[in-house]
Amino acid sequence: MKIVIQRVKSASVSIDGVIKGKINQGFLLLVGVEDADSNFDLDYAVRKIAQMRIFSDEADKMNLSVQDIQGEILSISQFTLYAETKKGNRPSFSAAGKPDFAKAMYEKFNDSLAQIVPVKAGVFGADMQVELINDGPVTIILDTKEARKNA
């Protein structure tokens, strides 16, 4: 899994002008799945995201997790994170997970994360409009392939 984690003051997702999910302070996640992903990747990502300390404490040090601040998460499926750009000018997305598998993993990821932190989500495969107010900005890329290699 590749996940872009953005610390936000607020974020929302709309489809055809209708807001489908909206959060206040927390994380906006752009979530990509590849066919090699497994429950290991899913569990690793959920644990890392829930415990990642990138919110400021009273000393203005990044020391608090999304749980600590009672934040929320907006999760958006994003197959384009697996774009291959080495050849030509049009990206290939063949490295992205097959739609049925990716949808199941994305939904399981959201369900697992929602047991820890409130989660709102976009609609898998939909054309969505995402609005956010970055906080910092703080943006982190989590690639579970690295953890899988070391497991």
UniProtKB/Swiss-Prot annotation:
Matching InterPro entries: Daa-tRNA_deacyls_DTD, DTD-like_sf
Superkingdom of the source species: Bacteria
Subunit structure: Homodimer.
Annotated localization: Cytoplasm
Gene Ontology biological-process entries: D-amino acid catabolic process
Organism: Lactococcus lactis subsp. lactis (strain IL1403)
Chain's role: An aminoacyl-tRNA editing enzyme that deacylates mischarged D-aminoacyl-tRNAs. Also deacylates mischarged glycyl-tRNA(Ala), protecting cells against glycine mischarging by AlaRS. Acts via tRNA-based rather than protein-based catalysis; rejects L-amino acids rather than detecting D-amino acids in the active site. By recycling D-aminoacyl-tRNA to D-amino acids and free tRNA molecules, this enzyme counteracts the toxicity associated with the formation of D-aminoacyl-tRNA entities in vivo and helps enforce protein L-homochirality.
Designated gene of the protein: dtd
Protein name as catalogued: D-aminoacyl-tRNA deacylase
Catalytic activity annotation: glycyl-tRNA(Ala) + H2O = tRNA(Ala) + glycine + H(+); a D-aminoacyl-tRNA + H2O = a tRNA + a D-alpha-amino acid + H(+)
UniProt similarity note: Belongs to the DTD family.
Motif (Gly-cisPro motif, important for rejection of L-amino acids): 136-137
